[in-house]
Swiss-Prot record:
Protein origin, superkingdom: Eukaryota
Record keywords, A-Z: Fatty acid biosynthesis, Fatty acid metabolism, Lipid biosynthesis, Lipid metabolism, Magnesium, Metal-binding, Multifunctional enzyme, NAD, NADP, Oxidoreductase, Phosphopantetheine, Phosphoprotein, Transferase
Residues where O-(pantetheine 4'-phosphoryl)serine is found: S181
Biological process annotations from GO: long-chain fatty acid biosynthetic process
EC number: 2.3.1.86, 1.1.1.100, 2.3.1.41
Positions annotated as active site in the UniProt record: C1305, H1542, H1583
Catalysed conversion reaction: acetyl-CoA + n malonyl-CoA + 2n NADPH + 4n H(+) = a long-chain-acyl-CoA + n CoA + n CO2 + 2n NADP(+); a fatty acyl-[ACP] + malonyl-[ACP] + H(+) = a 3-oxoacyl-[ACP] + holo-[ACP] + CO2; a (3R)-hydroxyacyl-[ACP] + NADP(+) = a 3-oxoacyl-[ACP] + NADPH + H(+)
Name this polypeptide is given: Fatty acid synthase subunit alpha
Organism: Lachancea kluyveri
Family in the record: Belongs to the thiolase-like superfamily. Fungal fatty acid synthetase subunit alpha family.
Residues reported in the UniProt entry to bind acetyl-CoA: 1774-1776, 1800, 1810, 1819-1829, 1843-1846, 1873-1875
Gene Ontology MF, one: 3-oxoacyl-[acyl-carrier-protein] reductase (NADPH) activity
Metal-binding in keyword set: yes
Amino acid sequence: MAMKPEVEQELAHVLLTELLAYQFASPVRWIETQDVFLKDFNTERVVEIGPSPTLAGMAQRTIKNKYESYDAALSLQRQVLCYSKDAKEIYYTPDPADLAPVEEPNAEEQTGAAATPAAAAAPAAAAAAPAAPAARPVAELPDEAVKASLLLHVLVAQKLKKSLEQVPMSKTIKDLVGGKSTVQNEILGDLGKEFGSTPEKPEETPLEELAETFQDTFAGSLGKQSSSLISRLMSSKMPGGFTITVARKYLQTRWGLGSGRQDSVLLIALTNEPASRLGGEADAKSFLDSMAQKYASISGVDLSSASAGASAGAGAGGAGGATIDAAAFEELTKDQKVMARQQLEVLARYLKMDLNGGEKKFLQEKNTVAELQSQLDYLNNELGEYFIQGISTSFSRKKARVFDSSWNWAKQALLTLYFQIIHGVLKNVDREVVTEAINIMNRSNETLIKFMEYHISHCDENNGENYKLAKTLGHQLIENCKQVLDMDPVYKDISKPTGPKTNIDKNGNIKYSEEPRAAVRKLSQYVQEMALGGPLTKESQPTIQEDLTRVYKAINAQAAEHNISDSTKLEFEKLYGELLKFLETSNEIDASATTRLAGVVDDDLDKDSTKEVASLPNKSEISKNVSSIIPRETVPFLHLKKKLPSCEWAYDRQLSTLFLDGLEKAAINGVTFKDKYVLITGAGAGSIGAEVLQGLVQGGAKVIVTTSRFSKKVTDYYQSIYAQYGAKGSTLVVVPFNQGSKQDVEALIDFIYDDEKNGGLGWDLDAVIPFAAIPENGIELDKIDSKSEFAHRIMLTNILRMLGSVKKQKSARGIETRPAQVILPLSPNHGTFGGDGMYSESKLSLETLFNRWHSESWSNQLTICGAIIGWTRGTGLMNANNIIAEGIEKMGVRTFSQKEMAFNLLGLLIPEVVNLCQRSPVMADLNGGLQFLTDLKEFTGKLRGELTETSEIRKAVSIETALEHKTVAGANADAAFAQVEVQPRANIQLEFPTLKPYETVKKIGSPDLEGLLDLEKVIVVTGFSEVGPWGSSRTRGEMEAFGEFSLEGCVEMSWIMGLIKYHNGNLKGRPYTGWVDSKTNEPVDDKDIKAKDESHVLEHSGIRLIEPELFNSYNPEKKQMIQEVVIEEDLEPFEASKETAEQFKHEHGDKVDIFEIPETGEFSVRLLKGATLYIPKALRFDRLVAGQIPTGWNAKTYGISDDTISQVDPITLFVLVSVIEAFIASGITDPYEMYKYVHVSEVGNCSGSGMGGVSALRGMFKDRYKDQPVQNDILQESFINTMSAWVNMLLISSSGPIKTPVGACATAVESLDIGVETILSGKAKICIVGGYDDFQEEGSYEFGNMNATSNSLDEFDHGRTPAEMSRPATTTRNGFMEAQGAGIQVIMNADLALKMGVPIYGILALTATATDKIGRSVPAPGKGILTTAREHHGNLKFPTPLLDIKYRKRQLKNREAQIKQWVETELEMLKYEAEGIPAEDQETFYAERTEEIKREATRQLKSAQAQWGSEFYKNDPRIAPLRGALATYGLTIDDLGVASFHGTSTKANDKNESATINEMMKHLGRSEGNPVLGVFQKYLTGHPKGAAGAWMMNGALQILNSGIVPGNRNADNVDKLLQQFEYILYPSRSLKTDGIKAVSVTSFGFGQKGAQAVAVHPDFLYAAVDEATYNAYVAKVTAREKAAYKYFHNGMIHNTLFVSKEHAPYSDELEQPVYLDPLARVSSDKKTGALVFNGKGIQSSSQFVSEENRKTATIVSELAKKTAGTDASGVGVDVELIKSINVENDTFIERNFTEAEIAYCKKQPSVQSSFAGTWSAKEAVFKSLGVKSQGGGASLKDIEITREAGKGPEVVLHGAAKEAATKANVKNVKVSISHDDFQSVAVAVSEK
């Protein structure tokens, strides 16, 4: 077992303490030390290595005080230095300024004649280039022919893509190419083409010698190859018209260079080729100037004289040249201009053209434009800029978002709730849980109930209190859902009403909060509070005394009117008098109290009880309506008004009774809005409208909501509302809308009413809630501006327009009996607040609709309900007033939370109020009594002033107190109490799987699994990695699971993208270790990286707009094509080389003329009429988005060399990085380590690709066709198997199987299948599998032509961002999103994985591929993979016992007994086989034969394990492959928790794949209500084709190890078509489960490729091994994890994650012997530590016959000898399989072994092997006694095997065994024991 972390930490602490103690306790003796090196050794240079000059300072003081005169006498000059500040002096680094030559610049040089030194910078430095001479040419230098050495040097450097300085002439070509034979052949071919014949083996000759050899026969001129390269350089990188002739002329006139020297300059230019075509002639000349200077420095030529001559000439010309007067020149050329003009006019008249037509048209247009501009200016001045900009249209039908998949969100909400309880996030049933229960009930259906029943029935209460709570709540919720199954959904809010609270702390900070109201704990009580009103809303209430007086007067009046008898009057008078007397004398009754009655009901929802959930479906009877407690002469806080004849609105008790009673019903039992169609505007986040929206969708309404800020963030907000609250039958539509635009208003209503076939919704509105508004704060009467007018338009004009449009649509459709109820947003603010522009006027003007409803003709289409909205806290308009709300309430006014006001407004939609509105307009006062508060403005100002004053006083007191405290106690008095914040540090983990305690593992898997499986037939994934749009598998996993990067994720992404790098050394003169910014070299702390880089990382990762710099400048908006054109006129001539000119002639024949240019030897080429040209053109391509690797990703960051990067296709780099990261994830830091465990032939590579090296293919076809430079070996990089070849050549050096699948988009899963088959067949034990593909414009264009990919322009039109264009399983999915990258897994058999101690991420239980049916469409999706569920059901009554793991285990036990018997028999028979063997060979014979028997027994056992463990279902028609694969590990189809979908976001695939998975589950009998969780990874990554399945498998393995199932975050609305697939759930957010047992991965590729893989949690493998094996494995994995962690972080720091191998693990001499010995293994070289093959171990017999087996052979040979003698009367042989001894069975151990035996066995390294050996000995002893057996269950405790130090095992008999031996005359029993990791063998001999 591994050492526990606590113990390690304790030991480290002790060690550190001891080291420090030793250091402090030991004397330093520094003075003596100084004397030694200063005096004894006379040291002159002292260097301190450390962070600061501590010792150096002491040494300097010592020298000055003690050795100054001593040094003077000896002439010693000492130097004391410190590494941290004197690095330059220590390393003798000169200052760059000192190296610069000191020259006296002349006047010409000071004006800019110096040439730019660097070719690469030439274009940028064009401005600084020397001006061309204006006068005579420069003096020519003596010409010199080009030298063979320069020509050779350039050709080699150019081919290697290096500068001349990087190619030393002392090296050979073979050395320079670094083993790249293809490049070497190219260079030799170029040399042959250039120089003719070449000497023998030129590649092995140093370039210096080779140049001398060439010089002997060299003619001194450029050859074919160099001329061709120069010609290509000029044509591809120089500006148009800048030909070789022009260049040579410039070099001759500017620098005085002859043709030979010009050749040399042009040759040098080949190794400094510009990256792109130069912009103009000045750039080209600057480039040539820099090349000339470079040539001068190489050849030693001085160009300054030429430069000076040119400058002098220019100066002379400028000073003494002839000049001409401008007027004279004009006079000279006047006649020429007149004649030219006359000729032009003659031609114009002939062609009937008006030369001044354009000018005339321009003047007309100018006038028109001026007139239009005048109108615009007028409108701008009149309406204002804000108004004009504000009325712009934003509505678009295409951008409408429709949310209606409540059926899916219900299951997701249930699972979220379930797992939150399981994980302890929710520990009791509070109001949040009850609210969620209501939402679930509102979505209740049969499928949902089955879903709940399954999960609750499988919730084991024994797992803890959380599971118990989940089960209890679940049962109640199920019953609730059953009860409301046929009921309509209801809006029911059970949240606690809150009130405002403003506090000012001691430091003067004003803090506002919402706190529950003490007496109002639920909405039913809230309604009561509203009905009662407050002191401010009531008139003075009568006392009891006053009421009695009124009653007395009323009775007297009645008596007088009805002639009541006097006796009755007297009796009444008497009673009344007694009552008054009683009240006067009573001390208990207060006659002055009011007669108002009120009651408060306790809140039973505050209790932690699940009973509330159980009571939810019950419709409570309201015995006493709230209206009964409305006090007389009191106006409720909420009430309805009626219109008086005076046209004023007054409180109406009867109407208010209806309203409040309806509100009470809604609060207690809820209210439904089913089949209601509602339009709501102004429902942004934090508004009243948003709360109203929640209530509407919760009640089942169909709602269209508008937003003026349409964006992904906004639509996600509304989607989250629907996902949480949307009830069955509800719909939410979100559209962009500007209520200030008339066009938008009309378009919106048209959209609502248009038929669906016309792109509309086909709705008829039942309610309109136009709440849109904008604030106008601070605008008084004299400041009414453009914004105020626009606000008025929004809040009044366009509301009227909107209502008019609704009326128009209803009338057009003849809708007269279904009026839409309009909830008008009125306000109590009738100028009361002031300073709010035209807000009050807008609200007041809406009230005219109450009259117009009667006076106009639209009462059958619209009803009016005005809502005077009171003080609502927290909204955008009132947020600033929150702090004074508490003060307002103290005055008797009731302010409202947003939820309360939303509840009030939704109460206006109840049937009672709707019916009232249909009779007459209704005015609802929801003001809370605010209208009764006079001088509101003054009062609010006073409240705010008091708060401000109190705050400022407390602030001042706080500051004064702090100053006083510091003065008294000191400035640092609080230092001890200061809060210390621990800053986070990034700690990137490799995420090795968590290994549970063995006891936990055994509980997870079936106990019968142990020993059942042949682990060599179990394939596991031990490492995985990827390179993709989100970086590595770690960073992609973070983004997929959590939707954001952690600190570690940001650090890794920043490193990947080259934003940061690691620094260790001096930085700005001080030592620094840590991250630095790659651009600025400034230090960056870990904690700051996320804040600094995250926005850049997110912008340049994932799915995004195509970045041209990543794809050879490919810009889809300017995709280049070529078109063939036949020219109709002769073209102007251009210049080309002779070779090129002849090629033109060869192609065009007589359609081209070519002539040599004598001066340069170049040719003039002229294309004639009829010649054919291919002319480039650009088109706008509509696929603008793709999943791209992070910008800045560079293989060099990982350690891949520049040579490799320049040589291979980019996809190969992705693969190399992925492979090395997969090995690191496997804990393998040196790939050669594999050969310690397997032969080189047993490591295979089965990875593949859909297209392979597309960049190479592009080079082969497109670039080669365009005659652009392309490496000659480009062909090899295009092969799909080349990537695997590079992996082997640079990393692995294996000789195992290589299989390269090509399965289009299913390649990676096909690779898995091939890899698994390769290992199972025995051809390999370790395989690299996976897939990879690139993204390039060619593939993108062709996918677009197939309409397979997402149309970016169409997506933009629909308002989608690039990140959401891949939307699998959604209603709006519209094509897949291409991506690029690689994904790799390392797989091996489980036996090897356990032995190596590599991490196991998952078991590959099933891999399969399948084709589809007859068809004519290659990409058409099919269901062939459904065959993995093929299973015959028929009418069979009984299931096959093979699926019973206990049955299979029993069969295996029987077979093990047979194998045991066979081994014993074979061992006994060896004595007969050995009879003919010479004595000297007998030992070898027994060793080899016993090894053979053991191996055969092992084979038989493994065959039996395969038969009963993992292959029992194969070819059995009753067991589907999928069912059998799961049953192997004791799992059923119900245990398949997750299905990772291919999910490409195409209409066809997502439906077909869902149907396939659903039918699989259904056919195999998956339980109803148990859907698999669907994972759709491509929403995040896009579709990388070949890598798709690999990324999905990586994600599946992460799911198994984390239990987190990622959601499809782009699934805004799941397609209704998918609702029919009841066995699939489509989550949109991640779910943290309590564990996933198995995951299915499906993949579909163009070309009839379907594939599936199932990964099972590794715990089910661990359950199949014994405890000792598991614990040993845990220790190995722990060690590997530490080593891998260290290697990974060192690799990041030093950019050495990838270290390519320079040599194979064997020498050339050992290559063939290693290949031919399957038992050859590597070992560590004693000198270098490298893992290499040693010749001594090859073909060694010790590799075959193990040392353990030799002991067995000795025992068996001794047995043969003893049985051949006469002294042996009894012999017993027993063989036991190690695994067959169950050491965990305490009963078995205690019954058969003595305490001494048990103690001995438990001390041994392998406890199970020791027990097995002892048991074998006991059995052998029993057999040797020759007595009758007492049965298989008899105890063997009486036979004791003792062991003494230095002695072998001895037999001690007790009890019955001793008696039996005595009866059989046995005097002594000897026994020998041998065991290995497979079996134990014991031989016992009884002596008589």
